[in-house]
Amino acid sequence: MRKIIHVDMDCFFAAVEMRDDPSLRDIPLAIGGSADRRGVISTANYPARRYGVHSAMSTAMALKLCPHLKLLPGRMAAYKEASQHIREIFARYTPLIEPLSLDEAYLDVTDCSQCNGSATLIAEQIRQTISDELNLTASAGIAPIKFLAKIASELNKPNGQYVITPAQVPAFLQQLPLSKIPGVGKVTAKRLEEVGLITCADVQQYDLAALLKRFGKFGRVLWERCQGIDLREVSPERLRKSVGVERTLAEDIHDWEDCEALIVDKLYPELELRLRKVKPDLHIARQGVKLKFQDFQQTTQEHVWPVLNKDDLINVARQVWRERREGRGVRLVGLHVTLLDPQLERQLLLPWE
């Protein structure tokens, strides 16, 4: 049985700013773009969250909820420096580190001899070391499989940890709401609820063939997670090749204006936020759009583009909408980017000789 730790820094960007300027600690603070340029919130501290401010929210909305919100543009160099220090701390315990972004990672400590091999004590020590050396707090989840470790890291935030031992997995899954499983959004959770599926226990008792017929490949993944199956290993060599966001709609849409509003107000801000966590300069190889129609057929279109660009994505989506929809309702809209190959990127950065 593996010992997996998921470490998630607490409001990371804001925490770095509060550490470097203590006067910011007790006031509502957010990192993001300006409201007049349709900016997006990257993260918010806990005083701001009490007003309802959260990541991926438009800055304009955040300022409506909290007019006295302190807004900073962010210092990506400082965040990257702190992130690198944190990864160096991880490496003192295990070489099996899978970074997910600047502020979170999976660690496999199965073969770690420190702390007598106790994953719980290792997580505590890592969090204490981060606090001592960087004056930042982290939360952690400990479990025998990845998706449960990630869920566990959210259960005792901020500056805490939660352990799910192998013996506790069955009971934990029995009462776990499906909405807590990564990949189950609000619309999907609602559709699951429509057929009586609310917790993992419900899925465990549901016919797999019926689940596959109704939900396709996702049904298989959901069934496995509800059985406590997650065969994914912590992969240090994992290279993220793409970043994407998509929304399954509660009702099919038929007007381009509704699609454009979804892209501008919801999807693009979230895509920019996710991309900035793994590629702060927003440099990419390609960007594209995905539409799924009411008959479950889907289509994608990509453009070669050097930097994430909202106007281009809207133009691509408009073209796909006009040329391929054929009068059908649209049930899902997605945006994605393909990242630059690291080797090619390094070659492009080499000076000419």
UniProtKB/Swiss-Prot annotation:
From the UniProt record, report the name of the gene that encodes this protein.
dinB
Per the Swiss-Prot or TrEMBL record, the active site comprises E104
What does the cofactor field's note say?
A: Binds 2 magnesium ions per subunit.
Please report the name of this protein according to its UniProt entry: DNA polymerase IV
Disulfide bond residue pairs: none
Primary residence: cytoplasm
What keywords are assigned to this protein? Answer: Cytoplasm, DNA damage, DNA repair, DNA replication, DNA-binding, DNA-directed DNA polymerase, Magnesium, Metal-binding, Mutator protein, Nucleotidyltransferase, Transferase
Q: Cofactor(s) for this protein?
A: Mg(2+)
Site (Substrate discrimination) residue list: F13
- Which catalytic reaction applies to this protein? DNA(n) + a 2'-deoxyribonucleoside 5'-triphosphate = DNA(n+1) + diphosphate
Family, per entry:
Belongs to the DNA polymerase type-Y family.
Q: Which Gene3D superfamilies match?
A: 3.30.70.270, 3.40.1170.60, 5' to 3' exonuclease, C-terminal subdomain, DNA polymerase, Y-family, little finger domain
Q: Report the EC code(s) recorded for this entry.
A: 2.7.7.7
Q: List, in alphabetical order, the GO biological process terms annotated in this UniProt record.
A: DNA-templated DNA replication; error-prone translesion synthesis; SOS response
